[in-house]
């Protein structure tokens, strides 16, 4: 059995006329179980597109994505999306709902209409409360998310991603729009999931210092191609070299 939980083989998306190239162009990379990997690059490099392709949210014209050794296809996509938690840029919460209700939304994909018609099962609600408690938000469980701070909202979004008990967590610019304190709280949460629970974390970041502090490995993209893959040491030099 492969040591890799994520494998990308020659991924290519459709040609984009405004860019004169595909957004992703012959992308191949591998991520091991329990790694914390960051995707870096300038705006438009293809970071978020690559991340979303890992859960079938981006159509590919060429290449394959393998999750846990299985090639992604429409038949197994629902299972893959249960195994892979996704933290979208901005959180994607419903502001009118409470924190716990937003977390429970993460269960909608595995519950039938009849199961949710009269509310979520008690075990789901208990799990949601447990996750919020682990993230320091137990006392805010019934507060509308619109009244929470940016950092608190992002931690609610993390809890929502975790309610499926995923093996892998994908985070698309999880600190965008957050202040320094909230940014640190979110990154510490991701780091704890990695170090304490052995979760595989793949995050799109812009802050090179943050990447070097928390991640084990970096994948740097430029114009839809991987230009560096390796240690997070001296990442600034990689951007200087690749811009010349």
UniProtKB/Swiss-Prot annotation:
Catalytic activity: phosphonate(out) + ATP + H2O = phosphonate(in) + ADP + phosphate + H(+)
Gene3D superfamilies in UniProt: P-loop containing nucleotide triphosphate hydrolases
Major localization class: membrane
CDD domains associated with the record: ABC_PhnC_transporter
Entry's Gene Ontology molecular function annotations: ABC-type phosphonate transporter activity; ATP binding; ATP hydrolysis activity
The protein's assembly and partners: The complex is composed of two ATP-binding proteins (PhnC), two transmembrane proteins (PhnE) and a solute-binding protein (PhnD).
Protein name per its UniProtKB record: Phosphonates import ATP-binding protein PhnC
Lineage of source species: Bacteria, Bacillati, Cyanobacteriota, Cyanophyceae, Nostocales
This protein's encoding gene: phnC
